[in-house]
């Protein structure tokens, strides 16, 4: 059953979603609930917010560790409740550009404004689109996610809060000393920063703890020399 909280406010299920073909070309619009009941392919986005942690090594040197903000989906979500997912995910509205939707939705879910991201300016949101993929996932409640998912990444500036934290901070949670993150409790039960290497391992060891789109989106978000790569087994285990 769809919870009442899903029918209120900006994220009500009756909002119009953008239906697309396999090339992300618009083919129509449909209400959110009907879209998921019928498993129609629609446009979506996933945002990954990263930060750097400064670590003191035994040899006296200092290095940075990359961390990702992840969320545990709230119990009232219409699917994937209680599973871990990326920092923010949603759908652009009818007539809304995908990046603009990500800029709008990020503070609504996480409390983080794009002004806190590296590269933000009047002409740049600070979010970078890394790629896109199509996936389909059926749920026990009869709903189906079938999305053309655009993956965006952003890095918190060192002077933003929470940005770079020192080794003695609690790196598994949001540190109030750096500025508490006021995330949307209707969307997420919990939010925390985790080491990228840790989440890459854990999603392979415990895939059932994560939302269906998380692993393929993570593969795209962490492409590049700064992250290394996921275990090659990850690509073989993806189902699109």
Where are these regions (language model features)?
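Nudix hydrolase/Nudix homology domain
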Residues: 1-3, 33, 82-84, 129-240
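Acidic, metal-coordinating catalytic segment for phosphate/diphosphate chemistry
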Residues: 5-55
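Residues that flank catalytic or metal-binding motifs in active/ligand-binding sites
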Residues: 13-15, 43-45, 88, 148, ...
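Short, acidic, Ser/Thr-enriched surface-loop or helix-capping motifs
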Residues: 21-22, 63, 176
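A glycine-rich, hydrophobic loop/mini-helix early in the fold
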Residues: 44-91
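Short regulatory "switch" loops immediately downstream of catalytic or recognition motifs
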Residues: 49-57, 111-115, 155-161
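The catalytic Nudix box helix
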Residues: 70, 85-129
């Amino acid at each position: 059953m769809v919870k009442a909280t899903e029918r209120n406010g900006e994220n009500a299920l009756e909002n119009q979603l953008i239906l697309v073909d396999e090339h992300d070309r618009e083919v129509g619009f449909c209400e959110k609930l009907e879209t998921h009941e019928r498993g129609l392919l629609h446009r979506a986005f996933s945002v990954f917010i990263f930060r750097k942690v400064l670590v003191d090594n035994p040899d006296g040197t200092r290095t940075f560790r990359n961390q990702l903000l992840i969320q545990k989906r709230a119990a009232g979500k219409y699917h994937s409740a209680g599973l871990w997912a990326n920092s923010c995910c949603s759908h652009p509205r009818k007539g809304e550009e995908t990046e603009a939707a990500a800029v709008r939705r990020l503070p609504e879910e996480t409390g983080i404004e794009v002004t806190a991201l590296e590269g933000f300016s009047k002409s740049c949101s600070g979010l970078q689109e890394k790629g896109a993929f199509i996936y389909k996932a059926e749920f026990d409640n009869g709903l189906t996610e079938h999305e053309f998912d655009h993956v965006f990444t952003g890095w918190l500036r060192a002077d933003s809060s929470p940005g770079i934290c020192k080794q003695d901070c609690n790196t598994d949670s949001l540190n109030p000393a750096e500025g508490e993150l006021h995330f949307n409790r209707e969307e997420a039960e919990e939010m925390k920063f985790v080491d990228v290497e840790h989440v890459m391992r854990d999603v392979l060891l415990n895939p059932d703890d994560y939302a269906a789109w998380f692993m393929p989106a993570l593969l795209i978000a962490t492409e590049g020399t700064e992250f290394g790569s996921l275990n090659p087994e990850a690509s073989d285990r993806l189902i699109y």
